[in-house]
Structure formats: structure tokens, C-alpha cells
Amino acid sequence: MKKKKFIWRLLPWLIVLAALAALVVFVGIPLFTPEVPRDIPAPQVAYFEGDETPIIMENDALSFEMDPTTTHFKVTEKASGREWLSNPADADSDPIAVAANKEMLKATLSLTHATQAGVADMNNYKYSIENGTYTIEQQEDGSVRVNYAIGKIEKIYMIPTAITKERFDTFKAEMKKSTQKKLTSNYTLYEPAKLDSKKNKDEIIAMYPEVLNQALYILKSDTSENNKAKIEGYWAESGYTAEDYAIDQQLVAGSKDNSGAVFNVSMVYRLDGSDFVVEIPYDSIRYKEAYPITFITPLPMFGAASVEDEGYMFVPEGGGALINFNNGKLNQNSYYANMYGWDYATRRNEMISETRLNFPVFGMAKNGGSFICIMEGATSYGGVMADISGRYNSYNWLCGKYNVLHSDQYNVSSKTAQLVFMYEQDLPDDCITQRYKFIDSDRYVDMANAYGEYLRQQPEMTATTVSEQMPVSVEMVGAIDKIVVKMGLPIDSVVATTTFEQAQQMIGDLTEGGVENLNVRFSGWANRGVNQRVFTDVKVIKQLGGEAGMKNLISFAKDKNANLYFDGVNCFAYDSGILQGFVGFSDAARYTTREQVKIYPYDIITYKESDWLDPYYLAKPSYAKENASNMINKLSGLGAEGVAFRDIGFLLSADYNPKALVTREEAKAMNVETMKEAQAAGQKVIIRSGNDYALPYADLITDMDLNGAGYAIVDKNVPFYQIALHGVKDYTGEPINLANDTVEQFLQCVEYGAGLNYTFMAMDTKVLQDTLHSGFYAAHYDSWKEDAVATINRYQEDMAGLNQQSIVDHEMRDSGVAVTTYEDGTKVYVNYSERMRRVDGVTIPARDYTVERGNGK
């Protein structure tokens, strides 16, 4: 008995000791233990020593010609003779650009690096090309590699800083008399016997100790760079060589080094059939530990269009967007958006707007021709930026920009405002790759079809199929979490909003009402509902009907030829702790600061974190992958044939824990493995939004963003992505009944050839009061079912046979009518205006659409 009492008394102390041990292991040791010095290769500096002979690559479709004195180049399409320049030819005469902006116009690369004071930008024109600190190699495979040393580098001239009097006189004798006098005027003779008379005696002895033994000529310290170049010519006249320079430099005890920020970056150019490819291997990047490189931008001015050019820039915003040349929107921000959205493993203290791109393509059309650039390698580190003429220079330009080393700020102490930046330990094992495709057309439809052809040629896409009928997606909200008062006490409870039996009734209503190609996404079916707990153990919610009710629903959906998918989130841990199998110390992803990624909802008023609400965690990728496997296995065991990933294929985040780093590219590969696993288990797959790397494994893409974020600099939204995918993949827009303007959302689906999407729940939406699920405010099924069935039936009947066809044309008429043309000649007219319109002899009612069949039908 006494022993048991002793154990119970000891238990709290054991818990405290365990907590302290965890604090030391996971916080104290990482923060205060000195890191093992990293072996970062030092940047190397080499100088261009070639001649001015152009460097040429050529094949049947393209020719590439580089000026070795600037590394500027042009790519010529042989069929059309159209030339694309790496940099504007007349940058120096730009009337708007100041000196720094002219340097940027002449750069083929720019980078951002950290300093003690913050960050700084460098371009490779001012800090490499102008100084000749680069080398050019024509490699065995025919590609051209340019190795840049970028930084404030003091140029090395082949002139001796110090030389013995004997050697000085010998070389001087080989010069003309006029040259001898000029040379001698730049040197001072120091002799051992006369050193005491020199004011800088100690400095001279420290730098040139041999002066104590013999007379030396020493270069004057105030010699200018221009004068050094002239002196180099004098020495060259005497036959002075690099070997001589090496001998004389041995007299120098201490030499100046390039102690500032210096970087090595290599760019590789190659021709691949009719495509031009540029690469930046990450293993070519060198930097000093004091100056981590954070961003890199290849070819920022490729194809830049002047104020005289006509055309537009294409950016992958939403389904696609155009920015007209010289549109005069200088009061608006320039364009920038992140590829695949935010990386949740990087900190943000406020969220004003969410930028995301689903497909890595940008392009430009001008003067009858165009190109698209596909960001093939290191894509997830990238973003797209674009700007118009008149802001910094007279050119319209766009390019890709890539994150290299990620960082976050660490608050050292609550007693000080000092913040320390902590960076990734090592460079990713990746290679930036950009593929430029040239199109003999300036129509965005042709640019989109070129991208579509590229997608179809990818090996993973060869087995994809598309439905004959336009798809319909219906999300049914199963259960939510809510604080419910029971016996006078607030209890965190699970509330059923659509039971499995009610879902059967809804599926029956829709299919019996004539809806075809119905895809049902059932969310909130396990682990406490929509904001589910982690899937370490998958438990079907009993309030919905339990496993028996779920099996009945699966069987019923099969009988009705409806595709049934069960939704789940695996990347986040909501309301999960040790009892649910989630341990933050070991299972949460980490920032570069080594802190766990803890996320709070953002306030819609202040845009800052709502830290009074419950947080949730970003799971480390391996933990998320394991939970996704548990979900897939559970569904297979219950006889389900469809899995709907709420995050995989849509969100993409890294884990910057230095002890187990998972880059964003590695996380992407893990997501692909998960989707392959689902396929191998016989599951169909739904993804949201449609990140390009997930396309081959998705049977349906829902919730595609057709609008984008609404950047003011954009002039026009276009269905670029949808044109590329139509006839290849089934896709839908965002839920019509949850949109701010339901008619507008429906009409956009018609214009973009997208399936229709709805979100329903059986219970009245009053149940959402006092919850965090107000986004379902318009999801009450009974309020929508008649209108939804009528809308779907009309749409599927009007669009019958078009889902498997490609889109061959698209245009927006001045009257506010969009016209989409399919391969059989069928035209779909969508009237966004408040008045009836007549276009091409076709009458389109206000805020409605009309389908005119092709081939005389």
C-alpha cells in the first residue's frame, strides 16, 4: 500500500521531468547548441578570356546565337524567321530607365540574398557581365553553359603589386621609352636602407616583408581601375605573362580578397527539337554562409516587348489571364503569384489575399507570334511575375522567380525585440528548368492548345479518359463539430448535417431527376466531421449511421450509377493530440526556426491570426502520407471505390526541420505516390483546384478557380487551362450555390466548358450558427434541389457530346458575350450583360447562354 502511495506521489514529478526533458531535447538543444560547421564550397571567380566569335547552336527548327562579350543571345524560329531576344537591344537608350534599371534590362539573371541588415538584390550584368567574371563552355551534348561569378569583385589585372628592382628593370628594358616613363610614374621604389624615412614603413613591411632584404617597386595604393587597365597594357608590351605575375605575387604577404557577397550561378542553354530550354542546376550555386541566397530569377527580360509592340502577356492566374502591353495601369501593383499557393511551413503573420497558381506556364504574344514558358524543374519553389512598360523602363516583361533557401524569423527573447533569421541548411537537390515553346500565332487559344499537346505527351497522361457527358459534382456535408449545451454544460459535440440515409435520398432525387455523370463527394464522414481528427485510426461517425449505414450508401450509389467519393484531409491535424495519435514534437512539420508549424484561423477584419481560437498543426509529410494510406485502406475495406483528397493535389507544404528536411519538391513526389497508391487500391480519385502534377491521377477535378484573385493590372480572364484540359480531364468550377453571384458562376462554367458543382446538406443551415462552418451558409438541399435538377438537366442536354471534344476557339466580344467553339464547329454563346444580345445572327437572352450546333445540327 505504501509503495502504491509512493508511486502516485512520484508520478507528477516524473511527468514534469519528462516535459523538461522534451523541452531541452526539442527546443534547448536545437537553439543553444552550436551547430556543426557546414562545408559550404566557397564561390570561385574566373574571367572570360575568349574572343568575340558568336557561340552558335542549331537544329532543324531553331538557331541560337550568343554574344560572348555580354552573354546576351537570340533564338530564331527558322520557319518564320522570328527572333526572340534575351534582352532588349536598345536598353541603353531607354528614356525612362535610370542607371540601375538599365542594368536590369541588360541582365540575364538576378538574385536576392540576405545581409545583416535585411536583403539585397544583384543582377548579373552589373556584378558579373560588365566585369567579365564569367566563363562559357560549349558542352559535349552541344549545350552552352555560362558560369557566372556575381558580386562586388575586384578585378585582377596582370600587373605586379610588388616586383624586385632587378625584374622591374629587366621588363622595363623591353618597353618603348615613352612607356617606360608612364610605367615608372605608377610605382614607388622602396629600398632597405631608406625605409626609415618612409611614413608608412610599418605598413609596407607588413605587406611586403621582402623589402627588408632587397629593393622593391610597389604599385601606388591610389591607382584607379582605369589606370590599372592601361598599366596592364604596358606590362603586356614587355612580354609579361600570368606566370610572371604568379612569381611576383609571392612578394605580397597579405592580399585583398573579395570578402563581400559573391555567388556562383550557372545557366545552361540547349535546343530540344522545336523547344528552347534553360537550366540552372542548384548544385552549381555557391554562396558564402553570411550571405544566403534566397531568390533567383532566370531570363527576366526574355522576349520583352517595347512600347511600339502590340500584344499581351499571359499569366496563369485562375484559368488564365492576359495583361495587355502598355495598358497604363501604373497605379496598380505589378503581378506576382506563388506556384501551388502558400507553403504553410513558412510563417505569415497576416493574410490579406491568397495567391496561388495551379499550372506552371506563362507566355507572351506579340506581332503575330508567341511563346509559352513551362516551368518544368523546381516548379514548386517558383512564382510568376510580370509588369508593364512605364513603371521602371519602357518594356513589358514577365518571368519566373524561384525561392532557393527558405527562412523565417526567430524571436530570441520576449525581453528584447531582436529577431534572428534562420535559413535552410542546404540547397535542394534540384534544377530549375524552363522550356520555351514557340507558336506561329498570337492567339491565346493556340498557346493553350500547345500546352495541352505538351500535357498529352507526358507518359503519365497517356491512359487518361474523359466522360461523354458533362460531369456534375455534389458535395454532401456529413457532420460538423459544434458546442452544444447539454444539461446546462457546453459540450464539444458532433452534429450530423447529412446522414448516410439522407444522402441516399439526395442521390435518388438527382439520378431519378435525370442527372447523369453524378459524382458525390461525401465530407465529414469520420473522426468528428469536416474538421476531422487525424486518420491514425479511421472511425466512421455513428451519428451518420455508422459503418453499416456507410456500406448501404456505397451499395445504393452503385445501383444508381453514381460515383461516390469520401473526402478527407491529411496534411493538417485538427483537434488532435496524443490520445488521437498526434504528438506535436514528432509529428508536426517545422519552420526553419525549428518551431512547430502551429496555425490559427485568420481574422477577416484585421487579416491577422485569431489567436483566441483553437490552432491546428501542419503535419510532416511522412505523417500525412501514412494517414492518407490509412484512409485509403479503410475505404477499400468498406467497399468504397472513390477517395476525394481535400488537400493532396491542391495544397503543398514542406517541412524545414533540419534533422529531417523534406523540400516542397519532395513533398510533391510523396503526394504523387499517395495518389498512385489510391489508384492501385482500385479507388477513383477527386482532387480540388487541379495542380498540374496531380492531373494524371485524378478522375475528376473539382473547385477549379475560373477567376483568379482579381489583380487590377489584369485586363482579361481567359480559359487557358481549361482549353488545354478539355477533352482530356473532367473538371468542374466552384460550388454554384455558395458563390456570391450564382448566375455569374454558372455562366462561367458554361463559357469554360466546366462541369457543374454544388454543395448540399440535409439539415437547415441554422445548425451552422455558433460554428466555424459558416461557409456552408447556402447549402440547404431542400432550398436548391428543384432549381439544381432543372439547371443540370438543361446544361447536360445543351452540352451533350462536347465534353470529349477539344476547344478550338474562344473570344470575348465587345457586347459582353463570350463565344467558345468546339472541334465539331459547335459554338456556345454566353451573355454576361443585362440585355439581350445578338451575335453572329444568334440571339442570346440576358444573363444566359445559347448553344449553336456545328455540322449543320
Q: What kind of feature is each model-predicted range?
A:
Residues 2-17:
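N-terminal Sec-pathway targeting helices
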Residues 18-29:
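Hydrophobic alpha-helical membrane-insertion segments, chiefly the h-region
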Residues 27, 59-60, 66-78, 96, ...:
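Active-site-proximal substrate-binding groove within the catalytic cores of carbohydrate-active enzymes
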Residues 30-37, 56-497, 504-518:
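Carbohydrate-recognition beta-sandwich/jelly-roll modules
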Residues 48-50, 129, 260-262, 812-813:
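Short solvent-exposed loop/turn micro-motifs enriched in small/polar/acidic residues
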Residues 298, 520-522, 566, 645-647, ...:
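Conserved beta-strand positions
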Residues 467-555, 559-624, 650-654, 660:
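Aromatic-lined carbohydrate-binding/catalytic grooves of carbohydrate-active enzymes
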